[in-house]
Amino acid sequence: MAKAKFERTKPHVNIGTIGHVDHGKTTLTAAITKVLHDKYPDLNEASAFDQIDNAPEEKARGITINISHVEYQTEKRHYAHVDAPGHADYIKNMITGAAQMDGAILVVAATDGPMPQTREHVLLARQVGVPYILVALNKSDMVDDEELLELVEMEVRELLSSQDFDGDNAPVVRVSALKALEGDAEWGKTVADLMDAVDESIPDPVRETEKPFLMPVEDVFTITGRGTVVTGRVERGVINVNEDVEIVGIKDTTTKTTVTGVEMFRKLLDQGQAGDNVGLLVRGVKREDVERGQVVVKPGTTTPHTEFEGSVYILSKDEGGRHTPFFNNYRPQFYFRTTDVTGVVTLPEGTEMVMPGDNTDISVKLIQPVAMDEGLRFAIREGGRTVGAGRVTKIIK
């Protein structure tokens, strides 16, 4: 069968299944692919449970994660769906951002109600900035008591509201992933209803090209007779020839300049956009004024900071991480985008030490300023070896 061309005509949305172990995240993922395959056979292939459950390993910021990606389409949208089978994999994926989510389906078994990992996943989704959650009340075929179902639904709504999600209005859809997967028409319809709710309730994501321009500097060199060129991959936004930019971070001063040329693969372009590897010719800037680790940005949109709070995952010994815990005033390097900057760690009150394999919140004071916004990911390294990963949750200074 010929592979269908990736249509850019539909909005593309990244989603994932989250929730307590054995509540049916992977079964639901398989059921969604089956139901959508039956409904729109030319748009979708069905993925078997085993295909999704035997998740391949992937590396993100030096951390190995087992994670499954499936894709499917509804009438309105193209979806990329991630399912991290293991609890630790889920935590690592959320913190490293291996697979970012525009929204999540929280799977809660009607037979159990919200469990400890349900709470932890919702808390983590809030910390890492998942914008929207809706609920699949799974295994609803196993609960005959309507009042019990209503009670579980109420508990889930309260849990969402407690983490600042819209618990009052979030869709809660009663499904049976297993029955839908077995081909039961009535329960299959509930999964179709769930996807209608996903279509309706998860907002269209803002495309990277629509955000303000930012390019991390990877390299700087001089072209005789033309001036200084900074190279890198455009992280977001668009840059046009003759636009003003600022080069910020690492140094104490901000350099203001104008982009007089954009090159890609030795060809001159009118513009570079998110995802492009480009060289920017910058006017009146000396080579020594710019270094790797800085960022080129639309003026006034990004500022450098030295103090922040972050949510981090520390690698276990088996994952190639530290063999010993670390304490207050730990001084590793924080790798932001293209460079390492040393920082001093302060642990939360009441935490004496952090063990390999833990996830925790920390405060960090960097020795050089780094251009950052809330949500920026980083790796924690010791002498070039990754020992953890994290995400900026709050900028202090």
Curated annotation (Swiss-Prot):
Monomer. Residues 83-86 are annotated as: G3. Residues 19-26 are annotated as: G1. Residues 138-141 are annotated as: G4. Transmembrane segments: none annotated. GTP binds at residues 19-26, 83-87, 138-141. InterPro entries: EF-Tu_GTP-bd, EF-Tu_GTPase, EFTu-like_2, EFTU_2, G_TR_CS, P-loop_NTPase, Small_GTP-bd, T_Tr_GTP-bd_dom. Pfam families: GTP_EFTU, GTP_EFTU_D2, GTP_EFTU_D3. It is found in: Cytoplasm. Mg(2+) binds at T26. GTP hydrolase that promotes the GTP-dependent binding of aminoacyl-tRNA to the A-site of ribosomes during protein biosynthesis. It comes from the Bacteria. It catalyses: GTP + H2O = GDP + phosphate + H(+). SUPFAM superfamilies: EF-Tu/eEF-1alpha/eIF2-gamma C-terminal domain, P-loop containing nucleoside triphosphate hydrolases, Translation proteins. It is an enzyme of class 3 (hydrolase). GO terms for molecular function: GTP binding; GTPase activity; translation elongation factor activity. Its EC number is 3.6.5.3. Residues 62-66 are annotated as: G2. Residues 176-178 are annotated as: G5. This is Elongation factor Tu. It comes from Mycobacteroides abscessus (strain ATCC 19977 / DSM 44196 / CCUG 20993 / CIP 104536 / JCM 13569 / NCTC 13031 / TMC 1543 / L948). Keywords: Cytoplasm, Elongation factor, GTP-binding, Hydrolase, Magnesium, Metal-binding, Nucleotide-binding, Protein biosynthesis.
